[in-house]
Each structure stands twice: as structure tokens, then as C-alpha cells.
Amino acid sequence: MNFKLLSLLLAGLATAGPIEQRQTSSSGNELRDGPCQPVTFIFARASTEQGLLGGSTGPAVCNDLKSARNQEVACQGVGPKYQATLAANSLPAGTSDEAIEEAKGLFEQAASKCPDTQIVAGGYSQGTAVMHGAIPKLSDAIKDQIKGVVLFGDTRNQQDNEQIPDFPKDKTKIYCAVGDQVCHGSLIVAAPHFSYVADAGDASRFLVEKLD
């Protein structure tokens, strides 16, 4: 698929909508800038979404986790090296090496700065590729510290056999809407790819149930 066609197909991420905007008090930089919390949520947003957490599923899950855990959750988005550009979707890993390494570094920072925190994570669209790339690179000890991962509109779903490589399948929940071809190895973006904020509540409950 040439880049011009890819850009046209993915332009829906920038123009379709409106995506429901969820208000959050989180800066999306709470691991880096704040104190350790009992739970740390690391999230990679979709292409073209603004802010470290994006404007849809990321803030929604962050809010739900904070509500469920008495606000004792640090929400951290992947960025600024992860720029969530459209072009990065066409790379072999579905995102940039810089994004994957940045996410890996955030997991490592959570484990080293806050050794007692329980880590949960998520990604939406290109952000799922960030998680698919970063988590397998982590040490076994950090993988054990990750309690659960939720992926919305998983761009690596087919390529990685409906799982994150080298990570327990029972710790992962993948949301693929009916008609979302992105989950089947395509870069064609259609309306179902923008429906995942409706799954945020279920995803948050999945993560909460994985916590001690």
C-alpha cells in the first residue's frame, strides 16, 4: 500500500467524529511528575489524538480507574517521543521504534520509581502497536508487575495472533468492534474504529478486577 493511499485511509482519524471527549483532571504525566500511587496506568493514544492520554478512551479509563480506586492512580501517557503521526502506522511495527522505546522506558520507570505500584496499561489504534512492541521487551519481573492491559481497535491483532507476544493472554483484553477492519490487518479506517469509548467502562472493570 503506498503512502498516499495510506494517508487517505487514515485521514479518518483526523476528520471523523466527533469522538466523545471525556473530561479528566489528569495531566497524563503523573508518573513522571507526581508521587508514587498504588496503581499506575500507562496509555498510548491513537493517531492524531492530542495530549498524552488522547481525547477518548485514555481519559475515560483513567477517570474510571481513579473513581474505582479512591483517586490513588497515576495516569501516564506515552509521549512526547511518541508523536502519534499517521505516517508511523505504515512502519513494520505499526508505529515508530522511538515510541516503543519510550513506552518501554515508562514501564521501567514505574517499576524502579514505584516498586510497590500495580501497573495497568492500554492503547488505542496506533497506541496498541506501541504496547505490542514495548511489553515483550520488558523483563519478566516487570511483566509480572503488569496486572492487565486493554487494547482498543488493535492494529496488531491479526499479526500477533490476538495477543501481546510473550505476555499472558489472560492479562489482556482486546476490543475489536464489528466491522473494524483495522483488527484484521487492514489500514482502512471506518466508523466502527471510532466507537471504543463505549467500551471504556468494561475495560476499566477488567483492569480493576486484575488488581490486588
UniProtKB/Swiss-Prot annotation:
Annotated positions for site Transition state stabilizer: S47, Q126
EC number: 3.1.1.74
SMART domains: Cutinase (SM01110)
Catalytic activity: cutin + H2O = cutin monomers
One of the Pfam families matching this protein, by short name: Cutinase
Family membership noted in the UniProt record: Belongs to the cutinase family.
GO biological process: antibiotic biosynthetic process; carbohydrate catabolic process; monocarboxylic acid biosynthetic process
Native organism taxonomy: Eukaryota, Fungi, Dikarya, Ascomycota, Pezizomycotina
Disulfide bond positions: C36-C114, C62-C75, C176-C183
Stated role: Catalyzes the hydrolysis of complex carboxylic polyesters found in the cell wall of plants. Degrades cutin, a macromolecule that forms the structure of the plant cuticle.
Major localisation: secreted
Protein name: Probable cutinase 2
